[in-house]
Regions:
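Metal-dependent peptidase/peptidase-like ectodomains
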Residues: 1-3, 38, 53, 91-199
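Sec-exported extracytoplasmic/periplasmic mature domains
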Residues: 4, 70-80, 106-110, 150-154, ...
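Structural recognition of the beta-strand scaffold that forms the well-ordered cores
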Residues: 28-32, 42-46, 87-90, 116-121, ...
Length: 262
């Protein structure tokens, strides 16, 4: 009433904030679908739980967490019993330094050689359009990915061969980065916006526009099914994916320093 009458008034607030010295304990959330034949071999699918608090994290990384969880639900709902263990991981502390993925690696060094592939979704609510895989992985991925083209003809899927890349010395800015540094394959989907929703990751990234309503339901649905197909297929191979030719082999530089005679 006072506002409608344009009357001036004063408000007084008593705001009490309480702070604790860090570090604050934070936890990864990990679901396990146990392997029936190779329980000590793994396929990882993941997204990260935290977000910049200027928005709600509906896209970064709600679009990755929701697809990861739905893919896991689809596998379980279908009665899936993978040969090797599937780890469904929602990482903690990604935005502040990849803390969750770094911590898991430090605690599980013995598992790194037994990870067939690490798939991480952290790039917006776009739809899988293809993959680029190494020569040694080609036949396995061709087999595993073949059903993806049967899901929805509106979203064609293309598999391509890639050249070996250099193994990174430092992690890039998402949770697959620390795994790549350790030599773990992190082959994931290439994604796009084939229906022209004009989604722009740059528009929402770490801003107040990172909201749930920026998600694209039909892309998210298709991504969930494609992720379930991919992860379950890799988990059911008779062998781990080959790492041959995944990274460029670094040649040892010859020792050209001459020893000094005393």
């Amino acid at each position: 009433q006072m506002a409608e009458e344009r009357r001036y008034f004063q408000l007084e607030f008593d705001i009490r904030n309480h702070f604790k010295m860090g570090p604050v304990p934070y936890h990864n959330v990990i679901g396990i679908i146990p392997g029936t034949e190779f329980p000590d071999e793994y396929v990882i699918m993941s997204g990260h739980l935290d977000a910049y608090d200027v928005g709600t994290g509906g896209i970064d990384d709600g679009s990755g967490v929701s697809v990861t969880m739905e893919a896991a639900r689809l596998i379980m709902e279908a009665g899936g019993k993978p040969k090797r263990t599937i780890l469904v991981v929602l990482w903690a502390g990604e935005e502040f330094g990849l803390y969750g993925s770094h911590s898991w690696i430090e605690r599980n060094k013995d598992k790194l050689d037994k990870i067939s592939n690490m798939i991480n979704r952290d790039g917006g609510p776009t739809v899988p359009t293809g993959m680029s895989v190494s020569e040694a992985m080609w036949e396995d991925f061709a087999l595993v990915c073949s059903p993806i083209n049967d899901i929805n003809p509106e979203f064609p899927f293309k598999l391509e061969k890639s050249e070996p890349g250099e193994k990174p010395e430092k992690a890039w800015g998402t949770d697959s980065g620390p795994f790549a540094v350790e030599g773990v394959p992190t082959t994931g989907f290439q994604t796009g916006d084939p229906k022209g929703y004009n989604f722009s990751y740059g528009e929402i990234w770490h801003t107040e526009r990172d909201l749930f309503n920026k998600s694209i339901p039909e892309y998210q649905e298709h991504a969930s099914i494609a992720t379930a197909v991919l992860v379950y297929g890799i988990a059911n191979l008779d062998h781990l994916l080959s790492r041959d030719g995944y990274y460029i082999e670094k040649k040892k530089e010859p020792n050209t320093k001459k020893s000094k005679k005393k």
